[in-house]
Amino acid sequence: SLLQLRKMIKKMTNKEPILSYSKYGCNCGMAGRGKPVDATDXCCXXHDCCYGKVTSCSTKADSYSYSWEE
């Protein structure tokens, strides 16, 4: 879900995602497009691509089980 994504970004970067990344690079925020300018921008492009492939699902509202290692 978008809420889970926000929490993950906040935990890993200690930044508020909406304020820090809504207009970052070419792909972060609404209507992203173009060649990513760096690794963070590439992550936004990959995120948008994944959402684009599952448009028939409630991907933005559904909760998902996930984990990561620091």
Swiss-Prot record:
EC number, as in UniProt: 3.1.1.4
Family: Belongs to the phospholipase A2 family. Group II subfamily. D49 sub-subfamily.
Subcellular location field: Secreted
Entry keyword set: Calcium, Disulfide bond, Hydrolase, Lipid degradation, Lipid metabolism, Metal-binding, Myotoxin, Secreted, Toxin
GO CC annotation, single: extracellular region
Additional detail: Hemolytic and neurotoxic activities are not detected.
Gene Ontology biological-process entries: arachidonate secretion; lipid catabolic process; negative regulation of T cell proliferation; phospholipid metabolic process
Signal peptide extent: none
Disulfide bonding pattern of the chain: C28-C44
Official protein name in the record: Basic phospholipase A2 2
Tissue-level expression: Expressed by the venom gland.
Binding site for Ca(2+): D48
Free-text remark on how the cofactor is bound: Binds 1 Ca(2+) ion.
Cofactor: Ca(2+)
The protein's role, per its UniProt record: Snake venom phospholipase A2 (PLA2) that exhibits strong myotoxicity. PLA2 catalyzes the calcium-dependent hydrolysis of the 2-acyl groups in 3-sn-phosphoglycerides.
Any GO molecular function: calcium-dependent phospholipase A2 activity
Catalytic reactions on record: a 1,2-diacyl-sn-glycero-3-phosphocholine + H2O = a 1-acyl-sn-glycero-3-phosphocholine + a fatty acid + H(+)
PROSITE patterns reported for this sequence: PA2_HIS (PS00118)
Active site per database record: H47
